[in-house]
Amino acid sequence: YGIVSNFENTVAKDSYGLAMNTMPWEFYVQYGDRKILEDNFTAMKKQVQYMTTWLQPDGTMYQKLGNVGDPTPCYWLCLGDWCPPYSVPLEELVHTFFLWLCSDYTARAAEVLGEKADEQTFRALANRTRDAFHKKYYNTEAGSYGDYGCNIYALVMGGMPDAQRERVIKALRKEIAETHDG
C-alpha cells in the first residue's frame, strides 16, 4: 500500500488521506484477512482524529486551504484538467461525507477487532456526522442534496426518513435523465 500522507497544507486535501481508512477496510471485505485491519487500525483512528480538526460547530467539515496570507478558502486550489469547467459539489459536503465514511469504516474495523470502546466512539461520530450532513445539505423544497453525486453520498449514508429518501431518488433520476441526458 505504501505511505498515505494527510497532505495537510497542500492541494491534495482529505480525499488522499481517506485511503488510510478505505484501503484496509476494502481489503478486509474482499479477502477476509483481519491482519490488514490489525496492522492499520491505529492509523485509521489517527486519520479520523485528524479529520475532526476540520469540524465546524454544526458537525460538518470545512475546507481550510487558501492562498498564502488569505484565510478565505480557495475552492479551486486543487482542481486540474480532470474537473469540469462548471460547478462542482461543495467541498464541505464532500469532506463531510468522507468523514462519515472514514468514521464508519473505523467503527466497522473496531467491531471486527473486538475493540468495543473504539467501535462505540467511531459509530457515534459517524452517526453525528451523517445527521449533520442531512440537516445542513438537504434542500427540502427541491428534495435534493444537489448535483454531481451529492444525492448519492446521502443515499450511501442512509439515516433519512423513507419519504425523504424517495424524493432524493427521484431528484437523482431527474438529474441523470434530464440534466445530463442519461
Model-derived features: positions:
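Active-site core of glycosidic bond-cleaving carbohydrate-active enzymes
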Residues: Y1-G182
